[in-house]
Curated annotation (Swiss-Prot):
Name of the gene: rplM
Record organism: Borreliella burgdorferi (strain ATCC 35210 / DSM 4680 / CIP 102532 / B31)
GO CC term, one of those recorded: cytosolic large ribosomal subunit
Keywords tagged on the record: Ribonucleoprotein, Ribosomal protein
UniProt name for this protein: Large ribosomal subunit protein uL13
Family of the protein in this entry: Belongs to the universal ribosomal protein uL13 family.
A Pfam family it matches: Ribosomal_L13
Domain of life of the source: Bacteria
UniProt xrefs under InterPro entries: Ribosomal_uL13, Ribosomal_uL13_bac-type, Ribosomal_uL13_CS, Ribosomal_uL13_sf
Biological processes, Gene Ontology terms: negative regulation of translation; translation
Function summary: This protein is one of the early assembly proteins of the 50S ribosomal subunit, although it is not seen to bind rRNA by itself. It is important during the early stages of 50S assembly.
């Protein structure tokens, strides 16, 4: 009577998914292209069982974030805005000044902007670790180099 067919939808639970760790070297790569590759892994779009409303992606470690490149004149002209939440408290930084002050911030801002807004995006962003140098402190996770 209740015949099982191949048309049944398979639902994957996030707790049953084994998350892998990946290392991406951002040295001499373009900022946006690195961010796109990272977001695909964080969201889990490289897996056959991708589900948009669940955290089924993997963890990502980025090294050499301070050596990321931009095209054109964006190095001097690209602006990042922040606000102190006081009247008249709008501040702007160029890519150059922001990367001198916080070397990992431009890459983190680009990735955060590509993730979904809300609780899912905040949880996905926690799966990202960014290091400005060529060494990272997560060797115990045995990350796969991409």
């Amino acid at each position: 009577m209740n015949k099982i067919t191949n048309n049944d939808t398979i639902w994957i639970k996030p707790k049953t998914v084994e998350k892998k760790w990946y290392v991406i070297d951002a040295a001499d790569r373009i900022l946006g292209k690195v961010a796109v590759d990272v977001v695909k892994i964080l969201r889990g779009k490289h897996k056959a069982y991708y589900t948009p409303h669940q955290d089924l992606g993997d963890n990502v470690i980025i090294i050499n974030a301070s050596k990321v490149k931009l095209t054109g004149k964006k190095y001097q002209q690209k602006l990042y805005y922040r606000h102190s939440r006081y009247p008249g408290g709008l501040y702007s930084d160029t890519f150059r000044t922001l990367s001198e002050r916080k070397p990992c911030a431009p890459l983190e801002i680009a990735i955060k902007g590509m993730l979904p807004k809300g609780p899912l995006g905040r949880n996905l962003f926690r799966n990202l670790k960014v290091f400005s140098g060529s060494e990272h402190t997560l060797k115990a996770q045995n990350p796969i180099k991409l």
